[in-house]
Amino acid sequence: MSSITIAPPPKPAGPPLQKETTAGNYFISNYPPFAFWKQEQIPDFHAALDRAPAPGVPLGLYTHIPFCRKRCHFCYYKVYTDKDSQEIRGYLDTLLKELTVYAAKPVIGGRKPKFIYFGGGTPSYLSPDQLKFLTDGMKALLPWDEVEEVTFEGEPGTLTDHKLRAIRELGVTRLSLGIEHFDDHILEINGRAHRSKEIGRAYAYAREIGFPQINIDLIAGMVEETEEKWVETVAKAVALQPDSVTIYQMEVPYNTGIYRQMKAEGKLVAPVADWETKRRWVNYAYGEFEKAGYTVTSTTTVVKDPAKVKFTYRSGLFSGADILSIGVASF
């Protein structure tokens, strides 16, 4: 492959930005952040559950599945890699008990969700039978007949043809594949469980059986990432022609394997690309997708056809929908 030099984006006005990637970077998904919650606020939480919902506000449901084949070295979510089928069934039972409690509250009871999101962890780690048990229980408590979108995160190595068919039959409309990169060495050194061949197989069959939307995730600036490998990954992603692509920049929060190694070695700077490089690589990716006809719709997302491809979960989150989150460490 011929060498390509990625031009830097224009420098922002104002004070210089931090260049090195250090530990402790994280995003705030809710406000105020959990770290600022106080014991004396619990009565306010219960009071909110006992109020009738505001008229016209849609309801969304986030369900956390915290199981994985292995923990990625950069992962900062609550995950388990050592649970057997009996322990997983116990977790699913508890999930439905939690949803039962919420479904009995005035703010939730009688409402039908507009969008549902299965995140993790790895939701596709569950077997088809486990998934059916969970979703049947959820539908009995909060019917899905008015749902516009069901998003389901999947790790390519767990997505057999049989499981993909089962996921589609459950009503999933938006499959989000955690690809992250197409280079097997990059995947291995960063602790990913899947490899590039599994990406191609899972993606092709997901297309064949007609998922309405397929999103793929990429991460810029992973451990041992190079400009050449990033260019190749972007080219392969464009060639797949997914409905949307979410592009993250590598971060190293404190509860990651990378940080533990940094701490043991007394290092302050993470062994990943610096912020300037990551911004440049993301800018390059956006440019390549735009050349292929995609539209940038957020700071992390490009979409093939904005008139057709909607991300109802994100739109609801940004516009003030009620979102009920269930499961360990859900948000």
PLM regions: where:
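Short glycine/serine/threonine-enriched helix-capping/active-site loop
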Residues: T63, I216, I247, T299, ...
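Conserved non-cysteine loop/helix-boundary elements of the Radical SAM core domain that shape
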Residues: V79-G287
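Local cysteine-cluster metal-coordination motifs and their immediate loop/turn environment
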Residues: T63-V79
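Flexible, acidic/Gly-rich N-terminal and inter-domain linker regions that tether
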Residues: M1-G60, R69, G109
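A C-terminal junction/extension of Radical SAM enzymes
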Residues: Y259-F331
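Short, solvent-exposed loop/turn segments at secondary-structure junctions
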Residues: R69, V252, S330-F331
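Short beta-strand motif preference
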Residues: L61-T63, L177
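Divalent metal-dependent hydrolysis catalytic cores, especially in the metallo-beta-lactamase
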Residues: G60, H73, V150
